[in-house]
Amino acid sequence: MAGVNEQGSPQATRREALGRVSVDSTRLPWVVTAAVLVTVAALAVAVRWGDGPYVAVVAVLGLLLSWGWPLLLDAPNPVGASVVLMVSSAALATAALVSPAGESLRWLPFAVCVGMMAAFLQQVPRGTIRPRLVDGLAITMTGIAAVASGMAMSPLAGSARGSAFVGVGLAGVAAGAVAELLGRLRRVGALAVFPVMIAGAVVGIWVATTSGFTMSAGLGLGMLTASFSYSVRRIFGAVSGAGEVGGQLALAVGSVLLPGVLVLALGSLAGLLA
């Protein structure tokens, strides 16, 4: 069918080359772990400064993810996907900043819709059937979801207890990233999820109790964010793009931002958004 065959194209050649690389997501490059810890540290500092600085840091991380996410997942049109993700990151940041104080989620759904519409406009075929259309849409929209999830924690950054609650979740992510290194041992491998959960729970309890929260809150939040973030790296790290530096950085950033919606949900249940 016309427009479907992409043999010999630079993108096809790149996929064939990457396809020969064996990827084991239990033994991700050290760059990923280091980038996770740096991302956690940046967000932990920003959330203490308030919702404005926090939104700015997430926007910068969104730009970094815009560059590496299409490389990680081998988007059929990486340049177009990067542009859409950059536009989406800017829209999400603007939506959070223009919303009334304490209501930074008011325009977030609209900004997500803007990003999704941009993804459709960029991917919809123009006269021919574009190969891997669904792949391209899925890759772009998961990137949008990652940035939106990170931005969703911005309402919690507007109060001292809310920012402390985010800190508990981020501490769980960091603890899980360190415990994940046990997966490099052949006898551990995929079983690293258990030390990840334990580390997230222990560190979560410690940070929660020092921040004025209950042990059960620290246990649940730390364990959930650690295991969620670890699962993101296990799933999205099992692709050939994880062998590229851009893909590794995007994987790290995405695995820290994606649990954000979970932190928001638990924070809402704890009455921190009232």
Where do the model's predicted regions map?
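N-terminal signal-anchor module of multipass membrane proteins
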Residues: M1-L63, P70
